[in-house]
Amino acid sequence: MKAELPEPLKKDGFGEYKLMPESIDDLWHLSHLISPGNTVYAVTLRTVDGPSDKLRSEKLEKRPVRIGVKCEKAEFVPESSRLRVFGVISYGPDMGQHHTLNIEAGYEISVVRQWRQIDLARLERAVSSSVHGVVHIAAIEDGEAELYRVRQYGPERITTLTVGSGKTAELDSRQALFAELLTFLEKVTGSIVIAGPGFVKEDFVKFAKTKAPEIAERMLIADTRRCGYGAVQEAIGNGVLTRVAEDLQLAKEVSFMDEVFLRIGQNGAVAYGKSEVRQAIDYGAAETILVADSFVKDGGIEKMIEGAERLGANVVVLSTEFEPGTRLVGLGGVAALLRYKI
């Protein structure tokens, strides 16, 4: 997702963001960023009547015009890779008429609304999840590792590391190989895919967790049948690039929900369901609020979120398309990790 803020948001968060979705994932994010009452501006084809056009019987040519639609409903349609925004035209030709914007990847829009902290956090996540040129793939097998940077035109090899006794071998043990590869990965700021057959990749991730846990947190394992560049091609072909941001987010969501159920089992500092969470917020005990995305637009929960943010609580929205989100739905769609028991 590309995002541009033409002017600073007002104190209450109201303002306009220019947005360019680049993938089906971005369209999914937009479906949660566009709510009823928001105004969405886009260029679309409309029949524009001139003063004498209505007297003509021939078919008029459609022209590109910029219109604003006050949203009544936003619907994500993954089957056709598009987002539909239904509403009434509030700016441009045919004001007052109903219109549907069909938004696809590469289609620039502007969204005018009051942006809450959870909206800005989702927008930041969508922008940062762009994988072009930032994902690195390490193809590991027994005795060798190759590191690739994913460019828009394809994988670019950075280095090849080998273990052995021959002249081409630079390292004398698996541990030395792991250490050298980790040294290269210290310079990487984005997500890292560890690909290859067998269990060497799992061993490397375990090694990284002990030596550099902050780097290991950004790693994603991809099983492949091939080695080297073939492993990179196979991982990309299996859709690893589109899964990177989701899987890293999923890991965080899994961790949060595991903690919720752990505290429930221990009768610990946790609340779930609207009533309990509202009480926790009122007492100032809520540290982290977890909300299922399908509940965010619920009026009661929306007010709870605003109250929690005013008190400095961290608000995390979980996708109901993933297992942690469905577990949260089973608890009433909202839960809170507390600073202390109430």
Swiss-Prot record:
Gene3D superfamilies xrefs: 3.30.1330.30, eRF1 domain 2 (3.30.420.60), Pelota, domain A (2.30.30.870)
Family: Belongs to the eukaryotic release factor 1 family. Pelota subfamily.
UniProt organism field: Methanocorpusculum labreanum (strain ATCC 43576 / DSM 4855 / Z)
Gene name of the encoded protein: pelA
GO process terms (BP): nonfunctional rRNA decay; nuclear-transcribed mRNA catabolic process, no-go decay; nuclear-transcribed mRNA catabolic process, non-stop decay; ribosome disassembly; RNA surveillance
EC number: 3.1.-.-
Main function: May function in recognizing stalled ribosomes, interact with stem-loop structures in stalled mRNA molecules, and effect endonucleolytic cleavage of the mRNA. May play a role in the release non-functional ribosomes and degradation of damaged mRNAs. Has endoribonuclease activity.
Protein name in the entry: Protein pelota homolog
An MF annotation (GO) of this entry: endonuclease activity
Cofactors demanded by this protein: a divalent metal cation
Note on domains (UniProt): The N-terminal domain has the RNA-binding Sm fold. It harbors the endoribonuclease activity.
Subunit structure of this chain's protein: Monomer.
Signal peptide: none
Any single Gene Ontology cellular-component annotation: cytoplasm
InterPro entries associated with the record: eFR1_2_sf, eRF1_1_Pelota, eRF1_3, Pelota/DOM34_N, Pelota_arc, Ribosomal_eL30-like_sf, Transl-rel_pelota
